[in-house]
Amino acid sequence: MTNPIKELKNIFIQIGRMFRVKKNEVIPSLSALAVYIILNALIIMRYYDSFSKVHVAFWKNFIKKFSVSGFDPITYVVLSTWGPKYDIHRHPLLAFFVYPLYLLNTALMDLTGLNLVQFIIALILLFLMFYSFIFMMRICRDIIGLRNTDAALLSGFLFSCAYIMLTFIVPDHFAPSMFMLLMALYVCGVKIRDKKRLNGWQAVLMFIFTAGTTLSNGAKIVIDALFVEGKRFFRPKYLIFAIAIPCAGMWYLSDAEYRYYRLPVEQQRRADVKKASEREWAKNHAAFMDTTTIMDSAEAEKAFKVWDNKRILAKYRKDQKLPWNAHKGKPLVKKGMLQYTDMTTPRWQSLVDNVFGETIQLHQDYLLGDTLRDRPVFVSYRNVVNYIVEAAIVLLFLFGIWCGRKSRFLWMAHLGFGIDFTVHVILGFGLNEVYI
């Protein structure tokens, strides 16, 4: 019978070894870190005067003023006044993961009279970036088999891509997601290389933190477990305790969290909107009846109804011209999760200008613009050189897949990529918002 204390000690030892920086990783990782320290400093300087204030409406202050390519500053809000303010069904545990940081920020606000949320987030982002870079290097070197110099160069290339750089300087959920996915790929890649098993507790732990941050990423942990375990994955014990129970538990928790925290707020908001609409109707009705020259009350009511319908239609048309409506594609259906799909935004142009364009090379026009504010969905490069560079990168990407077509690790990674491609490109979730 195994000693649970000894087993727990071994777990912490394994985790500690994974985060130990090796000699040949020091110079590349610190060089990358230096660049990202400068980038984070620029973000802090840009918003410090507004975001360091304590006695303000945090949501309005952060959401209205922060604008970097559409990324959301919700984490700034949560660390300033805690609550499950993320989309709960997409990020079920993220608010709880950052709760200790909220306590830290609250204590610092009491001590200094300043909101130091930017500095706290910057330190976390730099930690995530540093180890994401290291895990990427290790994947290239220890699993793919490249030399250390080549691994450092490829990692440097990845972390020089436009939206990777933005990911690690903005207070969104993408940085922790990327960190955990790279760590999972590294851990599972080593298991495949050494022909070792992915223990149930390892799969569960990775699933909780990955799916808890972004629910859809939990599917990638299931895929990783399948590739590592092979036929053993389908053993009833593994399926039940390492896969089924964590998946069901995560969904139950997200649903319970939604019903407890978000549903009452949404119901109250709908009630407030309804009351406001009724007040507006009563005000308009009274004003119309006081000023109309129609003496017959029934005819006056008909005339008011016609006038009110025109007012509602004009308001609807005006709302449809706003960026968040004008740039939205038509969904597959208008209810449930499928209401977030997009069947009309052009796929080819999305791939050229956004998926393999803006994410790698920022466009000169509408630089760091937001499609929900002031940026068109599609922006073209001024110079043909940008398209040549993009085409070269895509061709190298496809050539790399061909060269690694016999690699189990490659197909494990690309099946996860396939999930993202299906969700975002084929179904169109967030297709009109480049950063997603």
List each model region and its residues.
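Transmembrane-helix motifs of polytopic, lipid-linked glycan transferases
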Residues: L123-I144, F399
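Membrane-interface alpha helices of multi-pass inner-membrane proteins
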Residues: L198-N217, I221-E229, A242-A248
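Lumenal/periplasmic acceptor-binding loop at the mouth of the active site in multi-pass
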Residues: P73-F119, A298-G404, F409-F417
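Short acidic/glycine- and proline-prone juxtamembrane loop motifs at membrane-interface regions
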Residues: I169-A175
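Membrane-interfacial entry segments at the cytosolic side of transmembrane helices
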Residues: N24, G230-A244
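Specific aromatic-rich, kink-prone transmembrane helix
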Residues: P176-R193
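Transmembrane signal-anchor helices characteristic of membrane glycosylation enzymes that use polyprenol
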Residues: R17-F71, T75-W82, A244-Y260
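Transmembrane-helix signature of polytopic, membrane-embedded enzymes
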Residues: M136-S160, L410-L415
